[in-house]
Amino acid sequence: MKRVAILTTDLYQPHCDVNDHFNLAFLYALAQQEKLQLGGIMLDEDKPDPEITPEICGDPSVESIAQLNYITAIPVPCAIGSRIPLRCEEDIQVVISSGKKIPSISLLLGILESTNLPVDIHMCGGTRDVLLASRIRPDLFTKDRVRVFVNAGTWKIQTPLEYNVRLEPYTFSQLFQLPCQVLWAPCFDEAVWPFHVTEFANYFMMEIGPLFERISDSMKNYFLYMFDRVVNTGWFTYLRGSVNQESLSKWSQQKRCMWSMPGFLMTADCYVDTDGNVTDNPENSVFDYVPVKVSCSPDGLVNWKLCAESEETNIKIFHVRNTEKYEEAMCTAAYETISCLGK
């Protein structure tokens, strides 16, 4: 049975982190291949904290979603989330009791109410909107039909806190109390550069050049619109224009950090073997998720331990089964998956 994917993302134009635009393209590619149904995009409202991320970012990037909607002919809805900080339980109750409608939460709850398909929520940005939705309608977050993929945190050394956890430690901590299945993918072993592939983190580094060699002109323009931090409103004209070869050459030399894509593949019931092939066979997969017991303090510090399959838990942690092959395999899978767009 095909699953519905919902993405929460801190996607901006001009961008904050280019990875968010790659995540978006990867999900659309899986939807175009009919491996999942892309139900909606929940956009973070708040700008990044300048003390954490000094880059100047724009508004939530509805342009990027519109570009991919056009390229794929898949009309995916999007909505913008809450801007009210949630630092404690009292803050959550104040927002809920106000009765004010929050667009992204309305989108999420509407999908959960209307579909008979299982739903996967991929959290690749802020944590507040999904948590608020789960408090408003906990009956919709049942273990048998909803999985929440939490792409945040570190699994080994937790100081300093990873970016998304540091933004709102309390809401992050509450995600582990959700009644549905929770699949936690830490970003790193510790949030200190340089980053490395490690056993329980989904980070990998990807060269941009090999992707640009494979993709259509419209997808090149999708990425260049983001990389060049274009601020004019002509996103559609830009998408259909000629490719700026100088810019393409410049960005082809880059390497960029990637996360989250393994979880998207799980929604598609797919895995990646050691040669980078996307397959439905988990036998030779470079990653999986394994059951854990988790507790998390209100300040975002996680204590976890592996547990046996027979032990009762609704939480799993991301696991790299082959640390030597993982990065290369994930890069190959990303290149081949995204290359289908616009062709």
Regions found by a protein language model. Name each.
Residues 83-84, 126-127, 270:
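Short glycine-rich anion-binding loops that position phosphate/pyrophosphate groups of nucleotides
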Residues 80, 124, 262:
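Short glycine-rich loop/turn motifs that provide flexible caps or phosphate-binding loops at active sites
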Residues 2, 52-116, 323-325, 329-343:
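Metal-dependent C-N hydrolase catalytic cores
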Residues 31, 69-73, 112, 179, ...:
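Structural signal for hydrophobic packing residues in well-ordered secondary-structure cores
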Residues 2-60, 90-198:
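Active-site histidine-anchored catalytic micro-motif
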Residues 31, 67-73, 174, 208, ...:
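Short, conserved catalytic or adaptor-binding loops enriched in Gly and charged residues
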Residues 1-5, 23-38, 166, 185-343:
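Conformational coupling and interaction surfaces
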Residues 79, 149, 265:
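Residues in well-ordered beta-strands of folded domains
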